[in-house]
């Protein structure tokens, strides 16, 4: 077969093969292009035969070769478009949407368990006549420590325990500074002060299952005339019963806080076992829940309140601890990791 006939045969067979390729034959199309038009393809092999032709025939066949190459190149380009279009259409068909189907129900958000706990606690205090007072998270050393009867050399002022921004500015380690500022402003001629101050506080703790460098506290303060330890105990009993049930009881253990004197740790009878002893209460029947005490006279005097005429009590509890006890949560880090699987349990 002469070279011209071979060129015609190559053109015809290639065009026929191209027509059979669809959207499922992208690789086959590329392989065919290389086999025909590639550097080692069929057309290149035929070109090698030009040297054996006569001088008269060589230009004629050379022109035919170029025409065949141009024709096949264009044919491959057109078929590639067809193959790609067919591929896209097949994908669209496979992913078609039935517009008559009902839409998916929108996922509803809900309050975080800490928000729920905080609101429940605040509602309890509002019902008892307390006012809610917010304060600064970035606080002065003076209000955070000195006004709370914490002298310069107190261990709690150590850099290991507190996030200092400057020597005089820090991230508050408790919400007590709000109480100091409120004491400065309160007009006792209009009645006693009853307040709680909820909010985030910060400590230089290593995060683990029971510790976090930030957590939430709610601290309470009552100051007026003839406020006694009996008032503190009665208030705490009412709070605990509203939080954990009317059958709960409390006990007070001696403790120490620089800003209260006397100071107590407050335990609640275990709501899991009813005081019989279990893993939650560590077999004691009691769970440590908060710290409290009578406001130290120095704290009152620094606010210009006559400690001989006025007295008061203060208490503080951690909202994470309350939530962990109420819902059986054993790792404080779950509150902050944003895992919806954790959060939706409390919806």
UniProtKB/Swiss-Prot annotation:
The record's free-text note on cofactor binding: Binds 2 magnesium ions per tetramer.
Cofactor(s) required, per the database record: Mg(2+)
InterPro entries referenced in this protein's UniProt entry, alphabetically: aa-tRNA-synth_II (IPR006195), aa-tRNA-synth_II/BPL/LPL (IPR045864), Phe-tRNA-synth_IIc_asu (IPR004529), Phe-tRNA_ligase_II_N (IPR004188), Phe_tRNA_ligase_alpha1_bac (IPR022911), Phenylalanyl-tRNA_Synthase (IPR002319), tRNA-bd_arm (IPR010978)
Gene Ontology molecular function: ATP binding; catalytic activity, acting on a protein; magnesium ion binding; phenylalanine-tRNA ligase activity; transferase activity; tRNA binding
Localization (cell): Cytoplasm
Main location: cytoplasm
Binding-site residues, Mg(2+): 261
EC number(s) from the headed UniProt entry: 6.1.1.20
Domain of life assignment: Bacteria
Pfam families: Phe_tRNA-synt_N, tRNA-synt_2d
UniProt cross-references to SUPFAM superfamilies, sorted A to Z: Class II aaRS and biotin synthetases, tRNA-binding arm
GO biological process, one term: phenylalanyl-tRNA aminoacylation
Keyword Hydrolase annotated: no
GO cellular component: a single term: cytoplasm
Reactions performed catalytically: tRNA(Phe) + L-phenylalanine + ATP = L-phenylalanyl-tRNA(Phe) + AMP + diphosphate + H(+)
Keyword terms: Aminoacyl-tRNA synthetase, ATP-binding, Cytoplasm, Ligase, Magnesium, Metal-binding, Nucleotide-binding, Protein biosynthesis
NCBIfam families hit by this protein: pheS
Protein family membership: Belongs to the class-II aminoacyl-tRNA synthetase family. Phe-tRNA synthetase alpha subunit type 1 subfamily.
Assembly mode: Tetramer of two alpha and two beta subunits.
PANTHER family recorded: PHENYLALANINE--TRNA LIGASE, MITOCHONDRIAL (PTHR11538:SF41), PHENYLALANYL-TRNA SYNTHETASE (PTHR11538)
Protein name: Phenylalanine--tRNA ligase alpha subunit
Native organism: Streptococcus pyogenes serotype M18 (strain MGAS8232)
Lineage: Bacteria, Bacillati, Bacillota, Bacilli, Lactobacillales
């Amino acid at each position: 077969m002469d070279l011209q006939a071979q060129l015609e045969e190559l053109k015809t067979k290639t065009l026929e093969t191209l027509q059979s390729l669809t959207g499922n034959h992208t690789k086959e199309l590329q392989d065919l292009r290389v086999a025909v038009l590639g550097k080692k393809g069929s057309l290149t092999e035929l070109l090698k035969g030009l040297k054996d032709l006569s001088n008269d025939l060589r230009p004629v066949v050379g022109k035919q070769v170029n025409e065949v190459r141009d024709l096949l190149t264009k044919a491959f380009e057109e078929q590639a478009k067809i193959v790609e279009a067919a591929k896209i259409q097949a994908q669209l068909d496979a992913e078609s949407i039935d517009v008559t189907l009902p839409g998916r129900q929108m996922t509803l958000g809900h309050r975080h368990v800490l928000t729920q706990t905080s609101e429940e606690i605040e509602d309890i205090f509002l019902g008892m006549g307390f006012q809610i007072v917010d304060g600064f998270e970035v606080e002065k050393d003076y209000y955070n420590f000195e006004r709370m009867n914490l002298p310069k050399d107190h261990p709690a002022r150590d850099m290991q325990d507190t996030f200092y921004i400057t020597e005089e500015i820090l991230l508050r380690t408790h919400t007590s500074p709000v109480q100091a500022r409120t004491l400065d402003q309160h007009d006792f001629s209009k009645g006693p002060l009853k307040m709680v101050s909820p909010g985030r506080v910060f400590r230089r703790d290593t995060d683990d299952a029971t510790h976090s460098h930030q957590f939430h506290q709610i601290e309470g303060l009552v100051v007026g005339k003839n406020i006694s330890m009996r008032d503190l105990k009665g208030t705490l009993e009412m709070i605990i019963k509203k939080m954990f049930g009317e059958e709960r009881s409390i006990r007070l253990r001696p403790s120490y806080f620089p800003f209260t004197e006397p100071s107590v740790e407050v335990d609640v009878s275990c709501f899991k076992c009813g005081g019989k002893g279990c893993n939650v209460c560590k077999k004691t029947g009691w769970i440590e829940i908060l710290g409290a005490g009578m406001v130290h006279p120095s704290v009152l005097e620094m606010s210009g309140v006559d400690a001989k005429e006025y007295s008061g009590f203060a208490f503080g509890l951690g909202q994470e601890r309350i939530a962990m006890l109420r819902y059986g949560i054993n790792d404080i880090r779950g509150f902050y990791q944003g895992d919806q699987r954790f959060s939706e349990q409390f919806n």
